[in-house]
Amino acid sequence: MYKKRLPVLTGMLALMLFSAACSSRSEKVVDLDGNSYNIVQIGSMIWTGKNLVVEHYRNGDAIPEVKDPEKWATLTTGAWCYNDNKQENGNIYGKLYNWYAVNDPRGLAPTGWHVATDAEWSILSLLLGGMENAGSPLKAASLWKEQKSDGGKKIGFEALPAGARRDTDGKFMLPGEYSRLWSSTESNVNSAWCRSLGYFDAALRRGMANKNIGFSVRCVKD
């Protein structure tokens, strides 16, 4: 009986120990287009507190918006879209980017910041109690399907169920149920590491995704 409870207790203890090191900060970071982002400190890392919405790389070059599903599915260069190609979704959930935009040498993140690496996501997960528990404190307190109060501490990360855009046909996973977030770390020639959260549990899952899928993006201060 005690052995079965140990992983749960360990996760709870880790969350209690490190929640003190998690805090929203009064400063904001501003991207090239003038969009501002709240920031949150988790351990020694400082993260953006909402999904990226920028439309230009750091050098000023425009990132193309691609609405056409067939074109999206065959892209090998950076692009963004709104979920379901509706700006009102972007106003709430931010933009979806393919990994080619994440990896573009012109820079997707604001100056002095970078798109979170796979290693940084893994550290974040450990700080918040491990994969099975880390999603709960990261999630926003609203907009998730079947949202129920879990009594957990929210830390200002405000992960939203922004959905995703598929690589096979360019169609959308609509908002409300899932958050998919890129890392900047390639896993192989066709895919990169990512993280996912679902409405149905508290996990922050690690996985690989094809590079022309559209996911949300979070940044970490250099």
What are these model-predicted stretches?
Residues 2-11:
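Bacterial N-terminal signal peptides that target proteins for export
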Residues 13-17:
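Hydrophobic core
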Residues 20-21:
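C-terminal motif of bacterial Sec signal peptides marking the signal peptidase cleavage site
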Residues 24-222:
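Conserved positions within compact, well-structured domain cores
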